[in-house]
Amino acid sequence: MELNISESRSRSIRCIVKLGGAAITCKNELEKIHDENLEVVACQLRQAMLEGSAPSKVIGMDWSKRPGSSEISCDVDDIGDQKSSEFSKFVVVHGAGSFGHFQASRSGVHKGGLEKPIVKAGFVATRISVTNLNLEIVRALAREGIPTIGMSPFSCGWSTSKRDVASADLATVAKTIDSGFVPVLHGDAVLDNILGCTILSGDVIIRHLADHLKPEYVVFLTDVLGVYDRPPSPSEPDAVLLKEIAVGEDGSWKVVNPLLEHTDKKVDYSVAAHDTTGGMETKISEAAMIAKLGVDVYIVKAATTHSQRALNGDLRDSVPEDWLGTIIRFSK
């Protein structure tokens, strides 16, 4: 795999955060952002990035018109000589949710075949959709004073070979971090050396970022409390939250809390028909590979007190009994 990454790459990365598409968009409404959740997530990220620093005035960085507004919100007159906030180093990656998946699944982009007009059109349509979402997430975080920079994998030189990452410009990501910005990447339609094209999921992107940037911990923000032994729903009221999953040296994993025999490697996955990225099964698989690197992974419901504690890094030494989520960590 070709990785463009300089020797002076950014070290001391504190956290990589995955914003699950289902948590920040309305899954049953095409291209609809869950504004309330996204606003809370942006606020929680700001608090986590300040790492115990005294709260400072939020200097919004989105100086563009918003839909339904006739004015531009610009805090430039308030900035003056004010000392900038010292944010710890975070990277954000988000999924597509109700953006992109519809276009990709209807056209078969994930299967490849750019010579087909429907696939080529779907490739364009998918990228329009996911880059629109990326812009709105960048704007939401910027309104919280977080210096975000949207970075699309396709435009940054990411490509695949039979769906495995073949090249990635990680040097640009590292330089962006070292310059004091927060990169915001996303799942994207990319070129594939064998298939012609495919979908590169945000979960796969995070694994490669974690491998080369070596964060202290990784947080997956989802629309459920964590990983269950079966999809939680009104028809499955007895679904069990798996609080800790241990990953072995060979990459295999097992549930260690709670100690339920039937959960070991027998988790029942549920994937929506339009989801071209593999759903929870892919998430656990990629999280296990990250944990194998010695990096703890927390899967937790977005916009909750549980997600704030995970983002803050409060769980690294000990996990309170009242914390709800799933921890995936390496176990020798």
Swiss-Prot record:
Q: What class of enzyme is it?
A: transferase
Top-rank lineage group of the source organism = Eukaryota
Q: Where in the cell is it found?
A: Cytoplasm, Cytosol
Cytoplasm listed as a keyword: yes
Spell out which residues are annotated as carrying N-acetylmethionine.
M1
Protein EC: 2.7.4.26
Which reaction is catalysed here? Answer: isopentenyl phosphate + ATP = isopentenyl diphosphate + ADP
**Which CDD domains does the protein's record reference?**
AAK_FomA-like
Q: Which GO terms describe its biological process?
A: terpenoid biosynthetic process
- Provide the function of this protein: Catalyzes the formation of isopentenyl diphosphate (IPP), the universal five-carbon isoprenoid building block of all natural isoprenoids. Acts in parallel with the mevalonate (MVA) pathway and plays an important role in regulating the formation of both MVA and methylerythritol phosphate (MEP) pathway-derived terpenoid compounds by controlling the ratio of isopentenyl phosphate (IP) and dimethylallyl phosphate (DMAP) to isopentenyl diphosphate (IPP) and dimethylallyl diphosphate (DMAPP). Controls the levels of IP and DMAP that are competitive inhibitors of the farnesyl diphosphate synthase.
Protein name, as recorded:
Isopentenyl phosphate kinase
Originating gene: IPK
